[in-house]
Regions:
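Class I S-adenosyl-L-methionine
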Residues: 1-199, 231
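Conserved S-adenosyl-L-methionine
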Residues: 182-242
Length: 242
């Protein structure tokens, strides 16, 4: 695998933890990045002892300097109200954050007076005073009634929220192949851990959904499967987008 490569293994929850031990041995525990939980279906009613299973696992490993295109998800309306509770006169949602941080610097640029104020005891400004003054001139500092300055962060200037390790990408409702994967899930993985022109390998390509996603994302691809039916389905899927 390339020094910038990554590997994602999608596995059933029943054997996932055993497979992880093998992956640790092959790729090294130090290269383990995530055990991602994928919500695969809606809740079901089963007459058995145990909790309903709606998830499976994706094990993610990479080397020291992998390709990593930070994925972001759009904020929901609920996110915006929670994370950016304030609104200015123009109707823009925002929040504020402290402009000082723990740790004291006695002689550095981040310990100088700003608008006649020094950082609180045991803290320093997050940036130099020139930057603070520029923010203030640009209207990016909010002053409280007691004179406490805070940095304004506008919601419409943020790229969205970071993707966490619980993903809700349910199985296709009408799959064309028994093990067909959710195309949005594959898009996320491919665009995060590869660049245009990178090679994407799916050694159990099944219906070819991974290869189609790679093709549409301008990646090169290699697909392997021992089933002649899988090869036929994959060929049809790839030809449908050419």
């Amino acid at each position: 695998m390339s020094e910038r490569g990554s590997i994602y293994l999608h596995i059933d929850y029943k054997i996932g933890h055993y497979v992880k031990l093998l992956m640790d041995e092959i790729f090294g525990m130090e290269n383990f990045r995530n055990d991602i939980t994928r919500i695969k279906c809606n809740p079901k009613n089963f007459n058995r002892i145990g909790y309903g299973n709606i998830k499976d696992l994706i094990l993610f490993y990479s080397k020291n300097k992998p390709i990593w295109n930070e994925p972001r998800k759009p904020y929901t309306d609920q996110d915006l109200k929670k994370l950016f509770p304030k609104m200015n006169s123009e109707g823009r949602r925002y929040t504020t954050v402290p402009i000082h941080a723990p740790g004291e610097t006695k002689k550095g640029k981040s310990s100088q007076p700003f608008r006649g104020q020094l950082p609180p005891s045991g803290r320093h400004w997050r940036t130099d005073v020139k930057a603070l003054e520029r923010w203030d001139q640009e209207g990016l500092i909010e002053w409280s009634r007691t004179g406490n300055p805070r940095k304004i962060i506008f919601a419409d200037q943020q790229e969205g929220k970071r993707v966490q390790d619980i993903w809700e990408y349910k199985d296709p409702q009408y799959p064309s192949y028994p093990t067909e994967k959710n195309s949005d899930l594959l898009d996320l993985i491919i665009r995060t851990s590869s660049d245009e022109g990178s090679i994407v390998l799916d050694c159990f390509c099944g219906s070819g959904t991974t290869l189609k996603s790679a093709y549409l994302s301008q990646r090169k691809w290699i697909g392997i499967d021992q089933s002649e039916h899988a090869i036929r389905v994959t060929k049809i899927k790839i030809e449908s987008v050419e």
